[in-house]
Amino acid sequence: YGKTLDNPVTFAQLLREIDKIEGLERIRFMTPHPKDIEEETLEVIRDSKKICNHIHFPLQSGSSRLLKLMNRKYTKEHYLEQVEMIRRILPDVSITTDIIVGFPGETEEDFEDTIDVVKKAKFDSAYTFIYSKRTGTPAARMENQVPEDVVKDRFNRLLATVNEVSHEHIRRYEGMDMKVLVEGKDDHEEGFVTGRMTNNILVHFAGDESLIGQIVTVHLDECKGFYYMGRLIED
């Protein structure tokens, strides 16, 4: 960012300036590319009371071989080094990711590399996808398309691992009082609203529409996997 401006600035400098704007209570910077994230940016997030404590850090695959075929410009080892840097500077950060299963040529060893990264990175959640051909892309023309039954089996194994790891990591907030930005009515429970903590974790609790847009304190009663059930604490 900012390299073509008359007075070049870094993305971290931009974030720092946005952080100074009065009236803003939450700033959400979500998705850096693994090859581009820098310590300066993480330090700005650490020092800010407004920038959300959440990094969406797309993995796609834990196999360095497949990452090269995907033209991702990083390796498994580099990705894990970046995760370590993020957690060193932001110890309580929530890290989420994207993962694709069944990319052409994916072997069992490649898939196990992905599972290994999930366990080591301790993601709070992961958006998991089954690879599908996109007309006109190099991957669609590749040989060694992975059989559908193999892809489905790997996808289910990945989901099981993600659920186990994320639940163990997310439940660290159980029993705590946390600030929640109320975003809307709960679609599944009458008389409930839903919101997000600064780390992007969803919280559902009893409340009415007048709370939407407010930041309130919620006691986190129970972790339900990727979200919490809680109760409003009156300030």
Predicted features along the sequence, with ranges:
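Conserved, mostly hydrophobic/aromatic
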Residues: 29, 57, 98, 118, ...
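Glycine-rich phosphate-binding active-site loops on the catalytic face of alpha/beta enzymes
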Residues: 125-131
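Short, hinge-like loop/turn segments at secondary-structure boundaries
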Residues: 45-47, 114, 143-146
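Radical SAM enzyme [4Fe-4S]-AdoMet core and its adjacent flexible, acidic
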Residues: 2-23, 70-73, 133-164
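A non-catalytic, amphipathic alpha-helix used as a structural packing/dimerization or gating element
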Residues: 81, 85, 113-120, 150-164
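Terminal RNA-binding accessory module
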Residues: 141-235
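Thr-Gly-centered strand-to-loop micro-motif
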Residues: 32, 69, 126, 205-206
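Conserved SAM/AdoMet-binding glycine-rich loop
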Residues: 1-108, 119
